[in-house]
Amino acid sequence: MRIDGLSLDFFRNYVHLDAAFDPNINVIYGDNAQGKTNLLEAVAYLSGVSHRARYDRELIQFGVDHAFLKGNVFARERDFLLEAELHRGARRVLRSNGVKLKNGGELSGIFQSVLFCPEDLYLIREGAAARRGFLDDCICQLRPRYALALAEYKRLHEHKTRILRDSEEKPSLLDALDEFSMSMAKAGALLIHYRAHFIKRLCQAAPAIHGDFSGGRERLTLRYETVSTVTDPEAGPQVIFQQLLQHQEEHRAAEIASRQCLSGPHKDCLLYTSPSPRD
């Protein structure tokens, strides 16, 4: 897998850029604030997501209404032209070899990228939400089914939140609450299942690498914390689905009272410790 070329229009600080890359190692250098990190961000965006922008509109240059990215990549033993059109106030448009894609998960199924940057410290500083984002970014590139389930869960979560928020003025909205809870549990069960298995693999590889970085002075441990009724996050999605339904039923009254979604994997956390072996 490699990227051979990149074209940008109105992306971050680039009015226009055409770049070609060597198939081996490329060194990108320049003065501060010239756009080195923006260039790397654009490459990573071809996997479907920005590592630092919460909204796509943040990627569009100030004073214009759109931005375009094109990447020539080689993957799956063939060439791909990946394209992204970003518009203020409208959904982005993604294409692969001219064919419109449904979501960023389909991009990540073609081109997988790994980006290391100073902002990675946010995994430590920012807490559970940032770590969930890390899990989502990684697993979406590995499991297209996860990307679809994540997009569906986010859509359902947004709708259910709206129902709870507006139910005080329109109590009839609560008639749809159980249907949304069931659909969220179905999508959420897949998220928990895939997250648990990814973290299991991460636990097998990360401690040794972390130990090398710390010169053996620290020992990394990772633990996945999810909905309390889920007894085994590595179980099959159907088992987890039933346990999520139980948790949602137990929290139904509290959700209505607080007008918030209190139950589901949107509150998951990846916990870590890195003590000295002497501790």
Segment roles from a protein language model:
Residues 122-214:
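An accessory alpha-helical subdomain
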Residues 196-270:
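Amphipathic heptad-repeat alpha-helical coiled-coil/stalk segments that mediate oligomerization
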Residues 47-130, 136-142, 146, 203-208, ...:
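Nucleotide-state sensing region of NTPase/ATPase domains
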Residues 11, 15-96, 145-146, 153, ...:
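Conserved P-loop NTP-binding catalytic core
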Residues 1-15:
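N-terminal pre-Walker A segment at the start of P-loop NTPase domains
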